Amino acid sequence: MAVTWKKIEYEEEITTTASSSTPAPTGGSSRNLFTVTALAAGATFAAPSGTPANGNRLIIRIKDNGTARTLAWNAIYRRMEFALPTTTVISKTMYLGFIYNSADSKWDMVAINEEA
């Protein structure tokens, strides 16, 4: 029996913004990273741009500018075990991991972690 190895190529999209009241990540690549480096206002995260495929991944990294900021989420983001965060913690980095679920057309939050 012959075994053939196939190299799997991943598309990556990396986007960074200092601050926005309506941050809009990208979601059309298999791997997407969206970073907010100094959030200076409350933010409502818009639906990711692009056409996602089932299983696409999106990491959102958020840090405020030294003042806690409110966070809200478009309905396309769906909580799983943990609630979507509603505020930042002053000067702490937060990571949120999402996987696109094409059966429900939702970005399911599968991970959340915050700087200690």
Which residue stretches match the model-derived regions?
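Terminal beta-strand-rich extracellular "head" domains
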Residues: 76-90
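Exposed extracellular interaction/assembly regions and N-terminal maturation sites
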Residues: 2-77, 92, 99-116
